Amino acid sequence: MAMSQVVNTYPLSNYSFGTKEPKLEKDTSVADRLARMKINYMKEGMRTSVEGILLVQEHNHPHILLLQIGNTFCKLPGGRLKPGENEADGLKRKLTSKLGGNSAALVPDWTVGECVATWWRPNFETMMYPYCPPHITKPKECKRLYIVHLSEKEYFAVPKNLKLLAVPLFELYDNVQRYGPVISTIPQQLSRFHFNMISS
């Protein structure tokens, strides 16, 4: 029987946080985003995106770092890959863009680990599925979620227009209404891992 993989999680207090220039969203509405996705699809084909699951611990319980836009919308750090870009390299590029400092010395040592989920967008709609429906031959997006193993201490630079929240797994679990289907199922995706809670 295979042993469950170990993920080291360090206290949130080990990490330091600063700010940097705002990271403006390319779209002002969901309709705008889907319209842009359609234009990009015509040019480049299926969109491939990657997102990072960054884990810390508080009170001996795993927490995930989420970016909050406005008062309610939360998302994992990540984004769209360039055509032909390697997924791990693309995720590191996106994480640095979202949370890296302004100098190379302030960029965390991103260690991209296991892919824990793959989601599919069959049409130019908001719904995504953890499988590609059988009648869909040309899905519009494939999104992969990766664990990103953090070092014991890091510095994160958060764009001024965003908040970085540490959200416990118990709050995410089954909370589709607040976090959507992708983020709210992360606790199930992570259940095969053993969390090594390292105190400071």
Swiss-Prot record:
Q: Does the keyword Iron-sulfur apply?
A: no
> Where's the motif Nudix box?
79-100
| InterPro entries reported for this sequence | Cleav_polyA_spec_factor_su5, NUDIX_hydrolase-like_dom_sf
Q: Does the keyword Zinc apply?
A: no
Boundaries of every Nudix hydrolase domain copy:
45-172
Q: Spell out the molecular function terms from Gene Ontology.
A: metal ion binding; mRNA binding
Q: Where is this site: Interaction with RNA?
A: R33, Y179
User: Which processes are annotated in GO (biological process)?
Assistant: mRNA 3'-end processing; rRNA processing
The regions listed as transmembrane in this protein's record are: none
Q: Which UniProt keywords apply?
A: Metal-binding, mRNA processing, Nucleus, RNA-binding
Q: Which Pfam families match?
A: NUDIX_2
Q: Show the segment(s) annotated as Interaction with RNA.
A: 72-74
- Gene Ontology CC: cytosol; mRNA cleavage factor complex
Annotated function: Component of the cleavage factor Im (CFIm) complex that plays a key role in pre-mRNA 3'-processing. Involved in association with CPSF6 or CPSF7 in pre-MRNA 3'-end poly(A) site cleavage and poly(A) addition. NUDT21/CPSF5 binds to cleavage and polyadenylation RNA substrates. The homodimer mediates simultaneous sequence-specific recognition of two 5'-UGUA-3' elements within the pre-mRNA. Binds to, but does not hydrolyze mono- and di-adenosine nucleotides. May have a role in mRNA export.
Q: Subunit structure, briefly? A: Homodimer. Component of the cleavage factor Im (CFIm) complex. Forms a complex with cleavage and polyadenylation specificity factor (CPSF) subunits FIPS5, PAPS4 and CPSF30.
Q: Give the protein name, as stated in the record.
A: Pre-mRNA cleavage factor Im 25 kDa subunit 2
| UniProt lineage | Eukaryota, Viridiplantae, Streptophyta, Embryophyta, Tracheophyta
Gene, per the UniProt record: CFIS2
